[in-house]
Amino acid sequence: MPATDRQRVRRSLAAVTLAWFLVLGLPGQATAAPQGGDQRARVEGAFLVNFIRFTEWPRARFASDREPWVVVVVGSEAVAGAVREVAAAAGPVQGRRIAVHQVDGDHLRRQRDILRASHLVFVDRSGGVSAQDAIELLQGTHVLTVGDSAGFVRAGGMLALVASGPRVGFVANPVAIRRGGLTVSAKVLKLAQDTTP
């Protein structure tokens, strides 16, 4: 690789790493969770954007180079709206915009095709859906599954956002990630508060 290409890659990695640490705080630390549901949803949205940024999907998951990342929030429209706001502020990730859709937990099975065609599904408690139902629905797909409790990864989910007092961090299930045919950056997995084998 020519020196200028290496320099560009290093600068890009440095910028992405800086952005990651600005969102997550220092390595090994969680991000302070602002008070209020909307603020917490924005922090969760920042995590979701960065999970997309640091995850590799099989190339076949995209019909074209312009196809957006599709994030589905199983939960309230308020949570989906906050995630949508953060995604818009983040701008394109790897040249793709992020489209955020909301699915009500009552209609989970009817929305099966939308969920299975997405890249990331965030199961928020406000959706009233059991972790097991969502995970079973997404079996055999290349969809990054993220929940909002540690029980989500114990049930077979890939990542879960967890609050510890005023801070938000995450836990990971590397086995479920590999089983889903995805690769989450090892640097990200090292930042997880816990990993479930």
What are these regions (language model features)?
Residues 2-197:
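Short hydrophobic alpha-helices and adjacent helix-cap/hinge residues
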